[in-house]
């Protein structure tokens, strides 16, 4: 396991009206912060021999270096990221300790899940070629910070996991942070009350166009047409908690199964700020 450091320039933000009112507390804004990565790549065998099945783990985990004990913004962001991406029990740990602990727990659960079944197969004389593929697990986590809308820091995490079943699973988590305070920005922080209905309608229109293109079917022109393709059969259109306040637009993420079958993959719909600014709280001057 190793660490690598990269420098990300975070432009100093000139805000006439503090973003979402949360930046008016006198704390120093994140500026030219050092982003550190913890890199882990490890193959752990089910038993103490190289012929037994393996759990392959790859983690590329980004966090903010805390320069001193008073760096409350970086600490707050790291705390939220660890709690959201790794789990609440890792929130108070140092990043390196959190990753080490997460790996150890994952490996232990892997062995607890399949070790006895594997031993039984070996005892019964099952050959290596006949062993079920699901004795081999795979887990990867890739994360990154990037600059978003003025005053906002974006964080994305992509998780891939295979632990048996018909196919692997992959999902993403998107987070937004106020650079002035380290506060995570939720939908309620960013969009006005009552904006859910009109924005859902806008996203539905985007989805219809997106699916018509993706499926190469110009006949997809309505909600009913989407439902005929297996989309939005179990839920109404909604504004997801998974969103990014990017530089020129807000992007909304629907993971597999959120609104469509697995085969449709991850769906991302974007709305330019020019179209949704009337629904946003406390706009900044750009």
Regions found by a protein language model. Give the residues of each.
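Compositionally biased intrinsically disordered regions enriched in Thr/Gly
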Residues: 24-286
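Bacterial Sec-dependent N-terminal signal peptides
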Residues: 1-34
């Amino acid at each position: 396991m190793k660490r690598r450091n990269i420098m990300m320039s975070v432009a100093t933000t000139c805000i006439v009206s503090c973003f979402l009112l949360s930046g008016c507390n006198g704390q120093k804004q994140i500026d030219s912060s050092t982003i550190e990565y913890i890199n882990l790549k490890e193959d752990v065998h089910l038993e103490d021999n190289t012929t037994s099945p393996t759990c392959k783990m790859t983690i590329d985990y980004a966090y903010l270096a805390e320069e001193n004990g008073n760096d409350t913004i970086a600490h707050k962001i790291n705390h939220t990221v660890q709690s959201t991406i790794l789990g609440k029990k890792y929130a108070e740990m140092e990043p390196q300790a959190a990753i080490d602990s997460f790996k150890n727990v994952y490996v232990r659960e892997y062995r607890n899940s399949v070790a006895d079944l594997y031993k039984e197969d070996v005892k019964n004389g099952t050959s290596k070629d006949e062993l079920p593929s699901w004795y081999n697990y795979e887990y990867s986590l890739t994360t990154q910070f990037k600059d978003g809308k003025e005053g906002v820091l974006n964080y994305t995490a992509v998780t891939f996991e295979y632990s048996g079943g018909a196919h692997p699973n992959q999902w993403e988590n998107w987070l937004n942070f106020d650079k002035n305070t380290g506060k995570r920005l939720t939908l309620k922080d960013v969009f006005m009350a009552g904006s859910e209905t009109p924005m859902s309608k806008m996203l539905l229109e985007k989805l219809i166009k997106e699916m018509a293109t993706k499926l190469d079917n110009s006949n997809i022109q309505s909600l009913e047409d989407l439902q005929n393709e297996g989309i939005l059969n179990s839920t109404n259109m909604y504004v997801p908690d998974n969103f990014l306040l990017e530089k020129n637009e807000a992007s909304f993420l629907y993971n597999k199964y959120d609104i469509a079958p697995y085969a449709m993959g991850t769906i991302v719909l974007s709305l330019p700020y020019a179209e949704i600014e009337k629904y946003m709280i406390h706009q900044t001057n750009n």
